[in-house]
Amino acid sequence: MSAFQPTIKRRESTKIYVGNVPIGGDAPIAVQSMTNTRTTDVEATVAQIKSLERVGADIVRVSVPTMDAAEAFKQIKQQVNVPLVADIHFDYRIALKVAEYGVDCLRINPGNIGREDRVRAVVDCAQDKNIPIRIGVNAGSLEKDLQEKYGEPTPEALLESALRHVEILDRLNFDQFKVSVKASDVFLAVESYRLLAKAIKQPLHLGITEAGGARAGAVKSAVGLGMLLAEGIGDTLRISLAADPIEEIKVGFDILKSLRIRSRGINFIACPTCSRQEFDVIGTVNALEQRLEDIITPMDVSIIGCVVNGPGEALISDLGVTGGNKKSGYYLDGERQKERFDNEDIVNQLEAKIRAKVARQDPKNRII
């Protein structure tokens, strides 16, 4: 890794816990996703949650729209280890039911679950059971009076909506909550979060909502969340993609990894290739990404097809390969090794070296 280190001053915030996962304060920025199965299909939902756990999800959100879904949630909760957030709208009784079943966090908007006595019932229950709440404001579901006041979703409108819900919880002396102000427009979301970050001390849940498909959504999320994270704003995040939820976790960690905020697994540094490449760089990277998904120890690996930039990148990598005629140069911890890799077998040889280094460096293969 380069000796140059960015200076990101994290916004000060209070710390809450979603299950055993700390959010805010000096805690690592948590990466989460949401199931897209029918919650009443317990087997499919449990399988998806476990697949998200395997790729590093810190928290998983589950939609609970009905009492039948709440009963299914009880079974789901018993079969998984990762903390679960129940996403609930309108019916306060569902929130009370999942609280009974051990939910780790409630995603509600106090303003849309009815009269104040209902809100108080949910908040009192959350207080008694030490369950945090996420207030989730979305530009697509802004209150009618705010749409009329501002004409359209604006940063000020999203902030006002969020502060309304915050005020309800403040009035009930409840402070274990986090807040999000999501929009599908990058600039609208970013400015809304900036305003909110100045207005409250609670942790912020980041996201660009309905960002799009796997490619466009990942780019949009990286731009928006990257701007905020580089300013020190954000305590947990979800990448919203019209794709397999596993991709949301991978993209989330890739964004944090790119900003050197939190690393998980291999950070591949690879050239885009040209006619100078001495081995199949693209095929090598694709193969290693798939083979090494189980590695969670942070590590920089450079895979460069020729000697133009290869040696320089290898010097600041944990492991590096620089393309050569029939055999390629191998670097370990920035030092050129006598050993060379056969270009026809470079994937197998590099995988073996990476796994050996992980075993030496971090026997528990832990995440940072």
Swiss-Prot record:
Its cofactor is [4Fe-4S] cluster. It is an enzyme of class 1 (oxidoreductase). Coiled coil: none annotated. It holds the Pfam family GcpE. GO terms for molecular function: 4 iron, 4 sulfur cluster binding; 4-hydroxy-3-methylbut-2-en-1-yl diphosphate synthase activity (ferredoxin); 4-hydroxy-3-methylbut-2-enyl-diphosphate synthase activity (flavodoxin); iron ion binding. GO terms for biological process: isopentenyl diphosphate biosynthetic process, methylerythritol 4-phosphate pathway; terpenoid biosynthetic process. Gene3D superfamilies: Dihydropteroate synthase-like, Sulfite Reductase Hemoprotein, domain 1. It comes from the Bacteria. Its EC number is 1.17.7.3. It catalyses: (2E)-4-hydroxy-3-methylbut-2-enyl diphosphate + oxidized [flavodoxin] + H2O + 2 H(+) = 2-C-methyl-D-erythritol 2,4-cyclic diphosphate + reduced [flavodoxin]. Converts 2C-methyl-D-erythritol 2,4-cyclodiphosphate (ME-2,4cPP) into 1-hydroxy-2-methyl-2-(E)-butenyl 4-diphosphate. This is 4-hydroxy-3-methylbut-2-en-1-yl diphosphate synthase (flavodoxin). It comes from Haemophilus influenzae (strain 86-028NP). The lineage of its organism: Bacteria, Pseudomonadati, Pseudomonadota, Gammaproteobacteria, Pasteurellales. The gene is ispG.
